[in-house]
Amino acid sequence: GQLYEAKAYREALPLIAQLLRELKTLDDKMILTEVHLLESKVNHAISNFPKSKAALTSARTSANSIYCPPLMQAQLDMQSGVLHADDKDFKTAASYFYETMEGFDSVDDARAIPALKYMLLCKIMLNQPEEVYSILEGKIASKYAKHREIEVMKAVAEAQSHRSLEDFERALQQYKSELSSDLIVRNHLSALYDKLLEQNILRVIEPYSRIELA
């Protein structure tokens, strides 16, 4: 866990493998769930997505055989959301992030905020910026609406609804520190920026029936 927090991902993997071998003889499903979840996060961090998915499946298998506390369930749902978003299945990812937000909120865990942020990100990636505002009027989400991490998503949704590359760039600049520290948001917004850029180019050339390239 400490190596993951310190971003020493490759050093963490052999230790996780060794720990899993020892835990399987003890048959402690709760700890197995935690370690497989950590394995999934570490593999995701080094972009080994097949192993990340396999580890998450193992974590869920272990969790399904015991009573899984809300906090652990929320962490599993968060990782599921992240992996579905990577696969561009933003609709399923948004559902997982909603479950995550509810789970963390039920135990007053601050990780409800990034869960909400990722759910809003999914709506933006689905080209549904208007849903960002309706979600933020909900009972749980409204508690976090003024948080700076959520303000980022509102600014991006606003830019997207206007198909404004200028507003999008302004939002990226205004919330630079929040965005640079979150690799998940940064990667998806980079793809969105490319899409907006393409839309803006198309909007410029739409009035012309014939274009001559120099």
Describe the function of each predicted region.
Residues 6-18, 48-58, 92-98:
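Helix-turn-helix repeat elements of alpha-solenoid scaffolds
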Residues 1-10, 14-24, 34, 38-41:
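Active-site lining segments of carbohydrate-active enzymes
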Residues 33-37, 44, 53, 57, ...:
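Alpha-helical scaffold segments of alpha-solenoid architecture
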Residues 2, 15, 21-25, 58-65, ...:
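Residue position in alpha-helical solenoids
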Residues 5-7, 24-28, 45, 64-69, ...:
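Short coil/turn linkers that connect adjacent helices within long alpha-helical scaffolds
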